[in-house]
């Protein structure tokens, strides 16, 4: 379950930022996890709830945004929604498709007090 290592990394990053800002509490955290990032959102939330116990973010609200996954056809330039890595362009039928969004995993925002 790599979601626990991701949750621990997020906790470490937020803890470091909270220290820099001399915050006493983290009240909200927003993550972005693309559909193609390989992250199971519910598992991440579960692991995160365990990882924050006893920290300044223990009571923080965790929000996870899942952006649309998009591909770009390198033949005709069509941009379209994708569900996986091996995708055919709906316009020209080419398989020369580059994934342009949906693989990301990042901290979008944190709210500190």
Curated annotation (Swiss-Prot):
Ni(2+) binds at residue 2. PROSITE patterns: HYPA (PS01249). One of its GO terms (biological process) is protein maturation. Keywords: Metal-binding, Nickel, Zinc. The keyword Zinc applies. InterPro entries: Hydgase_Ni_incorp_HypA/HybF_CS, HypA/HybF. Zn(2+) binds at residues 73, 76, 89, 92. GO terms for molecular function: nickel cation binding; zinc ion binding. Belongs to the HypA/HybF family. NCBIfam families: hypA. Involved in the maturation of [NiFe] hydrogenases. Required for nickel insertion into the metal center of the hydrogenase. This is Hydrogenase maturation factor HypA. It comes from Prosthecochloris aestuarii (strain DSM 271 / SK 413).
């Amino acid at each position: 379950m790599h979601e626990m290592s991701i949750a621990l990394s997020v906790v470490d990053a937020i803890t470091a930022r909270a220290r820099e800002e001399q915050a006493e509490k983290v009240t909200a955290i927003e993550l972005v996890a693309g559909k193609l990032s390989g992250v199971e959102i519910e598992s991440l939330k579960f692991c995160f709830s365990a990882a924050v116990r006893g920290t300044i973010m223990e009571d923080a609200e965790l929000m996870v945004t899942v952006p649309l996954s998009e591909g770009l056809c390198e033949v005709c330039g069509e941009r379209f929604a994708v569900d996986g890595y091996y995708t055919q362009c709906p316009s020209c039928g080419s398989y020369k498709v580059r994934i342009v969004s949906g693989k990301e995993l990042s901290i979008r925002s944190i709210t500190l007090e």
